[in-house]
Amino acid sequence: MSRLFILFLLLLTYPICSQAETLSREKIDGWLQHLGASDKFDASKGIDWGVMPGPFYTPELGLGIGTAVVGMYRPDPQDTTSQNSTLTLSGYASSTGAFGLSVKNYAFFDNDLWRVFVEGSMANTPTYYWGQGFHAGDKDNEKEKYTAQVLTLRPTIYRQLIDNVYLGTGWSLAAQNADEMDHDDLPKIESTPQGPSVFSSGASIDINWDDRDFVPNPRRGQYANFRYTHYAPGLGSDTRFDEFQLHYSHYHALSEKSVLAWEADGAFTQGDVPWSMMPLLGSDERMRGYYQGRYRDKNVVSGQLEYRRQLTWRHGIVAWAGAGTMGPSLSSLNNGRWLPSAGVGYRFEFKPRVNVRLDYGIGKGSSGFYFQVGEAF
């Protein structure tokens, strides 16, 4: 692991304008070949694997190191219509004692007639709970410390209806247990209707327009999605509630090496929504720079604009700006305050069109580094 960590630091710091650069590139390319980080995809390998480590710092996890294992594959090598499928496995451990694993799979079948997307995670993370709403999130001295033990799984199967239009059906499972609560803090979680342990299970249906050229890192196209998920005791859930998700993103290639991307995203819930399932304002994808879980409410809206620039060799950079708001009802969103988010990031093309990203996000009164695979959106 130490050798991999040193390699990642070299990728971040090595010069891009010197005679020694060529030798450095050749040497680093040789190391990367051993890690599976070829700049070409070989479908004959079945799943073309690669591994990449890297450091990170986030407000909630502290300083840590993560490792991403990326596999590219084509279920049918003769299928020239579908884009390449990707399987990403990520793991991390941090100075706060947090550790976790996650999986993302984007699979395309039968000339893109069928798609199977799977996202899942398990984590053990020391964190804090502030409560619901801006008022609770602003009271930093009244937060409750606990360890979040989380297991999530969300598979979805899509069928193409007409060109670029897909109908999907799936399932959402989320189990969360608040362990090791600090009894010197105010008992916020214990006071919620659901208590420290919550299990949510629901069926979902969604419809989307998707003409992105490559899902993990689009250069052009649009993605518009509506998803409805119903959670109920009859489906295994502790409580009954509904979640509506709306998303739109657009990708415009300004040149061969630059892309302008923007998105608008909303999550809206109603019913007996557990504290653990309320939408969040702050994550490694949206509103980067805020402590994940500090701001949560029944309804959340955010947007961001990001400029992406490919440099020489495998290097790239991004810069973004965004904002978000939240509230207990739809009408309250008109009166809620907006939080800003901005930042810059470094990109390293680990596999063809698959980037490892290191972002630094700045929010109002907080900031953080994020190490992930694939673009934020």
Predicted ranges, named:
Residues 23-24, 192-196, 203-311:
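C-terminal outer-membrane beta-barrel translocator/porin domains of Gram-negative envelope proteins
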Residues 48-50, 64, 98-100, 148-152, ...:
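Transmembrane beta-barrel architecture of outer-membrane proteins
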Residues 51-53, 87-91, 116-120, 167-169, ...:
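Membrane-embedded beta-strand positions of outer-membrane beta-barrel proteins
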Residues 21-23, 37-47, 61, 75-84, ...:
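Short loop/turn motifs that connect adjacent beta-strands in outer-membrane beta-barrel proteins
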Residues 1-37:
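Cleavable N-terminal export/targeting peptides
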